[in-house]
Protein backbone atom coordinates (compact mmCIF):
# COMPACT_ATOMS: atom_id res chain seq x y z
CA UNK A 1 0.00 0.00 0.00
CA UNK A 2 1.53 3.32 -1.08
CA UNK A 3 2.04 5.80 1.72
CA UNK A 4 1.58 3.26 4.51
CA UNK A 5 4.23 2.71 7.14
CA UNK A 6 5.85 -0.63 7.65
CA UNK A 7 5.04 -2.00 11.09
CA UNK A 8 7.61 -4.81 10.91
CA UNK A 9 11.27 -3.76 11.04
CA UNK A 10 12.92 -4.27 7.67
CA UNK A 11 15.58 -6.58 9.18
CA UNK A 12 12.78 -8.93 10.22
CA UNK A 13 11.30 -9.33 6.75
CA UNK A 14 12.28 -12.68 5.32
CA UNK A 15 11.64 -14.14 1.90
CA UNK A 16 12.41 -17.34 0.00
CA UNK A 17 14.80 -17.43 -2.94
CA UNK A 18 16.02 -20.69 -4.46
CA UNK A 19 14.46 -22.50 -1.46
CA UNK A 20 16.76 -20.66 0.99
CA UNK A 21 15.42 -18.23 3.56
CA UNK A 22 16.92 -14.79 2.97
CA UNK A 23 16.63 -11.68 5.12
CA UNK A 24 16.07 -8.29 3.47
CA UNK A 25 18.42 -6.41 5.81
CA UNK A 26 20.55 -8.89 7.77
CA UNK A 27 22.00 -8.02 11.17
CA UNK A 28 25.56 -8.41 12.38
CA UNK A 29 25.62 -10.17 15.74
CA UNK A 30 28.34 -11.45 18.00
CA UNK A 31 28.27 -14.71 19.94
CA UNK A 32 30.75 -15.75 22.61
CA UNK A 33 31.20 -17.56 25.89
CA UNK A 34 33.50 -16.48 28.68
CA UNK A 35 34.29 -17.30 32.26
CA UNK A 36 34.02 -14.97 35.23
CA UNK A 37 37.65 -13.89 34.58
CA UNK A 38 36.78 -13.26 30.87
CA UNK A 39 38.80 -16.30 29.73
CA UNK A 40 37.39 -17.77 26.53
CA UNK A 41 40.21 -19.91 25.20
CA UNK A 42 43.44 -21.75 25.81
CA UNK A 43 45.77 -23.12 23.14
CA UNK A 44 43.19 -22.49 20.39
CA UNK A 45 40.27 -24.28 22.02
CA UNK A 46 37.65 -23.76 24.71
CA UNK A 47 38.93 -24.34 28.25
CA UNK A 48 35.69 -26.11 29.21
CA UNK A 49 33.46 -28.86 27.87
CA UNK A 50 29.93 -27.72 28.66
CA UNK A 51 27.53 -29.51 26.34
CA UNK A 52 24.61 -27.10 26.83
CA UNK A 53 26.77 -24.08 25.90
CA UNK A 54 27.97 -25.83 22.73
CA UNK A 55 24.38 -26.80 21.79
CA UNK A 56 23.29 -23.19 22.37
CA UNK A 57 26.07 -21.92 20.08
CA UNK A 58 25.23 -24.37 17.28
CA UNK A 59 21.48 -23.75 17.56
CA UNK A 60 21.75 -19.95 17.70
CA UNK A 61 24.07 -19.64 14.69
CA UNK A 62 22.49 -22.40 12.56
CA UNK A 63 20.88 -20.28 9.83
CA UNK A 64 23.42 -17.48 9.69
CA UNK A 65 26.79 -16.77 8.15
CA UNK A 66 29.58 -17.38 10.64
CA UNK A 67 32.79 -15.33 10.60
CA UNK A 68 35.70 -16.64 12.63
CA UNK A 69 39.45 -16.60 12.74
CA UNK A 70 41.62 -19.46 11.54
CA UNK A 71 42.25 -20.92 15.01
CA UNK A 72 38.55 -20.86 15.87
CA UNK A 73 37.76 -22.49 12.54
CA UNK A 74 40.28 -25.27 13.17
CA UNK A 75 38.46 -26.05 16.43
CA UNK A 76 35.06 -25.84 14.65
CA UNK A 77 35.85 -27.59 11.33
CA UNK A 78 33.92 -30.80 12.03
CA UNK A 79 30.72 -28.74 12.42
CA UNK A 80 31.31 -26.45 9.41
CA UNK A 81 30.23 -28.82 6.62
CA UNK A 82 26.56 -27.76 6.36
CA UNK A 83 26.99 -24.13 7.38
CA UNK A 84 28.02 -20.90 5.73
CA UNK A 85 31.41 -20.09 7.24
CA UNK A 86 33.96 -17.43 6.38
CA UNK A 87 37.34 -18.01 8.00
CA UNK A 88 39.88 -15.22 8.32
CA UNK A 89 43.50 -15.78 7.40
CA UNK A 90 46.10 -13.32 6.16
CA UNK A 91 47.86 -16.19 4.38
CA UNK A 92 46.57 -16.20 0.77
CA UNK A 93 47.61 -19.86 0.39
CA UNK A 94 45.50 -21.02 3.32
CA UNK A 95 42.48 -23.03 2.16
CA UNK A 96 39.63 -24.19 4.37
CA UNK A 97 37.73 -27.41 3.67
CA UNK A 98 34.24 -26.08 4.44
CA UNK A 99 34.70 -22.32 4.55
CA UNK A 100 35.43 -19.39 2.31
CA UNK A 101 38.59 -17.44 3.14
CA UNK A 102 38.79 -13.70 3.71
CA UNK A 103 41.96 -11.84 4.61
CA UNK A 104 40.30 -9.22 6.81
CA UNK A 105 37.09 -8.58 8.73
CA UNK A 106 35.80 -5.96 6.29
CA UNK A 107 36.25 -8.40 3.40
CA UNK A 108 34.45 -11.13 5.35
CA UNK A 109 31.56 -8.79 6.18
CA UNK A 110 31.26 -7.82 2.52
CA UNK A 111 31.11 -11.49 1.53
CA UNK A 112 28.55 -12.21 4.26
CA UNK A 113 26.28 -9.31 3.28
CA UNK A 114 25.87 -10.77 -0.20
CA UNK A 115 24.47 -14.00 1.28
CA UNK A 116 21.26 -12.40 2.63
CA UNK A 117 21.51 -13.95 6.10
CA UNK A 118 22.31 -12.71 9.57
CA UNK A 119 26.04 -12.66 10.27
CA UNK A 120 27.56 -14.08 13.45
CA UNK A 121 30.99 -12.96 14.63
CA UNK A 122 32.38 -16.06 16.36
CA UNK A 123 35.89 -15.11 17.46
CA UNK A 124 38.71 -15.06 18.33
CA UNK A 125 39.82 -12.28 20.61
CA UNK A 126 41.23 -9.90 17.96
CA UNK A 127 38.17 -10.34 15.71
CA UNK A 128 35.78 -9.73 18.62
CA UNK A 129 37.62 -6.53 19.49
CA UNK A 130 37.55 -5.27 15.89
CA UNK A 131 33.91 -6.24 15.25
CA UNK A 132 32.35 -5.06 18.50
CA UNK A 133 31.54 -1.51 17.28
CA UNK A 134 29.89 -2.97 14.15
CA UNK A 135 27.57 -5.48 15.83
CA UNK A 136 23.99 -4.76 16.82
CA UNK A 137 23.69 -7.56 19.38
CA UNK A 138 25.89 -9.63 21.65
CA UNK A 139 24.83 -13.16 22.61
CA UNK A 140 27.04 -14.08 25.56
CA UNK A 141 27.23 -17.19 27.69
CA UNK A 142 28.72 -16.27 31.05
CA UNK A 143 30.12 -19.18 33.02
CA UNK A 144 30.28 -18.48 36.73
CA UNK A 145 33.72 -20.05 37.20
CA UNK A 146 37.33 -19.10 36.52
CA UNK A 147 39.57 -20.93 34.07
CA UNK A 148 43.20 -20.74 32.99
CA UNK A 149 43.52 -19.30 29.51
CA UNK A 150 45.42 -17.28 26.95
CA UNK A 151 42.47 -15.67 25.12
CA UNK A 152 40.12 -13.22 26.81
CA UNK A 153 36.78 -11.78 25.77
CA UNK A 154 37.11 -7.98 25.45
CA UNK A 155 35.12 -5.55 27.54
CA UNK A 156 31.67 -5.28 25.97
CA UNK A 157 29.77 -3.10 28.44
CA UNK A 158 30.46 0.17 26.63
CA UNK A 159 29.25 -1.22 23.29
CA UNK A 160 26.26 -3.20 24.58
CA UNK A 161 24.81 -1.47 27.65
CA UNK A 162 21.30 -2.93 27.37
CA UNK A 163 20.66 -6.46 28.59
CA UNK A 164 17.46 -7.64 26.87
CA UNK A 165 17.41 -11.33 27.73
CA UNK A 166 18.75 -13.63 30.46
CA UNK A 167 18.33 -17.37 30.98
CA UNK A 168 20.16 -18.95 33.88
CA UNK A 169 20.78 -22.63 34.56
CA UNK A 170 23.27 -25.07 36.02
CA UNK A 171 24.82 -27.55 33.63
CA UNK A 172 27.74 -29.95 34.00
CA UNK A 173 28.35 -28.45 37.45
CA UNK A 174 28.62 -24.87 36.20
CA UNK A 175 26.18 -21.98 36.69
CA UNK A 176 25.52 -20.50 33.23
CA UNK A 177 23.78 -17.35 32.08
CA UNK A 178 22.73 -17.05 28.43
CA UNK A 179 22.57 -13.29 27.88
CA UNK A 180 21.58 -11.04 25.00
CA UNK A 181 22.74 -7.42 24.92
CA UNK A 182 21.87 -4.64 22.47
CA UNK A 183 23.40 -1.26 21.76
PLM region spans:
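Low-complexity, intrinsically disordered segments with a bias for serine/threonine
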Residues: 8-11, 23
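Polybasic, lysine-rich low-complexity intrinsically disordered segments
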Residues: 18-21
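Extreme N-terminal starter segment of soluble prokaryotic enzymes
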Residues: 26-30
